[in-house]
């Protein structure tokens, strides 16, 4: 399970180093293989360990190619999907189209989301946090069916 936000740097070759605490689980459970694709609702990237991505692919396979919305979803997620492997230094290469999609420059945030990571431009991440906090403050959580019984 991946949790927490880590500030990392994008090097001049377009690589990022995965934080050390995640490398061993990624190597042992997923052979160091990760699939990177776009988030369809935010300007960030999604990084799935290979076995998690295979579950996503099974769901995508069930979508219709004749339904415009379903086909569009498949086209975006699969069209941008790029499999990478951790190198000996725990780095992965982010292809240019993916870096452009998420406006990634030097400072990046890698954010654990349990079964995957989100990869954000640092400033976009800070803005997103503000938006999330505003959403939580403005909505009555008890009126949200899935959150009504959620407690910390």
UniProtKB/Swiss-Prot annotation:
Compartment(s) of residence: Cytoplasm, Nucleoid
One example GO MF annotation: DNA-binding transcription factor activity
Keywords: Cytoplasm, DNA-binding, Repeat, Transcription, Transcription regulation
SpoVT-AbrB domain segment(s): 5-52, 81-124
GO CC annotations on file: cytoplasm; nucleoid
InterPro entries: MraZ, MraZ_C, MraZ_dom, MraZ_N, MraZ_sf, SpoVT-AbrB_dom, SpoVT-AbrB_sf
Main location: cytoplasm
GO terms (BP aspect): negative regulation of DNA-templated transcription initiation
Protein biosynthesis found in the keyword field: no
Keyword check for Transcription: yes
Subunit structure: Forms oligomers.
Family in the record: Belongs to the MraZ family.
Protein name (Swiss-Prot/TrEMBL): Transcriptional regulator MraZ
Species, as recorded: Shewanella baltica (strain OS185)
């Amino acid at each position: 399970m991946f949790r927490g936000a880590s500030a990392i740097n994008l090097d001049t070759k377009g690589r990022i180093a995965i934080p050390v605490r995640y490398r061993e689980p990624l190597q042992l459970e997923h052979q160091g293989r990760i699939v990177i694709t776009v988030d369809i609702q935010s300007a960030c990237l999604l990084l799935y360990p290979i076995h998690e991505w295979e579950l996503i692919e099974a769901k995508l396979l069930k979508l219709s190619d004749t339904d415009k919305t379903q086909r569009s979803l498949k086209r975006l997620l699969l069209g941008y999907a790029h499999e990478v492997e951790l190198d000996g230094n725990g780095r992965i290469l982010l292809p240019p189209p993916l870096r452009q999609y998420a406006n990634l420059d030097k400072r990046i945030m890698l954010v654990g989301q349990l079964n995957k990571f989100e990869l954000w431009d640092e400033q976009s991440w800070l803005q997103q946090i503000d938006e999330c906090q505003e959403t939580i403050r403005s909505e009555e959580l008890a009126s949200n069916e899935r959150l009504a019984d959620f407690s910390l």
